[in-house]
Structures are given as C-alpha cells and as structure tokens.
Amino acid sequence: MDRVTRLASQKAVVVFSKSSCGMSHAVTRLLRELGVDARVVELDEEPAGADMENALAGMLLAGTAANGGGRGRGVVVPTVFIGGRLVGSTDRVMSLHVAGGLVPLLRDAGALWV
C-alpha cells in the first residue's frame, strides 16, 4: 500500500490501469480530452503490479464500505486518484463528470489551469 500511496501523491492525477482494460482506456481518454496530463500506472507492466492491485482492492473496499456501498473485491482498474485522494473507479469518475463535479475537483488539485 505504501507504493500505491506514494505513486498516487506524485502527480495531480494518477490512474492505476491495465493495458488491456477498455474502461481504463475510456477514463484516461476522458481525462486527456479535458486537458489533464495524468500519470498512468499500468499494473500489468509493473514488477509489483499484483501487490499494488491487492492494495488498491483493499482501498476500494474500504472506500465503498465507508460510503455505504458494496463493490467487493472484483475489478480494481481503473482506480483514479486526484490530488492524492482516492476518487474511485470508472463509475465514480463518470458520475462526477456527468454531475459537473469532475472539472472543479481537477482544478482544485492543480490538474487543470482553466
């Protein structure tokens, strides 16, 4: 978990992804189209990728439990951090975007200048 936390705080937006995941590509494309230069960590290309994936699963599980939801330990990619804080996966990022909350969050984190 330390490695995940350290990586997540190194840039305004960090996406933990897998190179073969379509949803990961969708989220990174959305961020890119908004003008965000996100750091993308491809877990399937990292030597410690499996350990990081387990850490992310635990973080997501803790986050959904704290929010009254139950996502379980299924799919963990993409997992998005903005401003060093866990935002969540595709559903959360897209919900924020549709509701108009993603851009202000990105601005507050310094990921957008406009």
From Swiss-Prot:
Main subcellular location: cytoplasm
Protein localization: Cytoplasm
Gene: GRXS8
Species name: Oryza sativa subsp. japonica
Keyword terms of this UniProt record: 2Fe-2S, Cytoplasm, Iron, Iron-sulfur, Metal-binding, Redox-active center
PANTHER family: GLUTAREDOXIN
Protein name, as recorded: Monothiol glutaredoxin-S8
All copies of domain Glutaredoxin, residue ranges: 1-113
Pfam family, one: Glutaredoxin
Domain of life, per lineage: Eukaryota
Family from the record: Belongs to the glutaredoxin family. CC-type subfamily.
Binding site for [2Fe-2S] cluster: C21
Organism taxonomic ancestry: Eukaryota, Viridiplantae, Streptophyta, Embryophyta, Tracheophyta
Protein purpose: May only reduce GSH-thiol disulfides, but not protein disulfides.
GO cellular component: cytoplasm
Gene Ontology terms, MF aspect: 2 iron, 2 sulfur cluster binding; metal ion binding
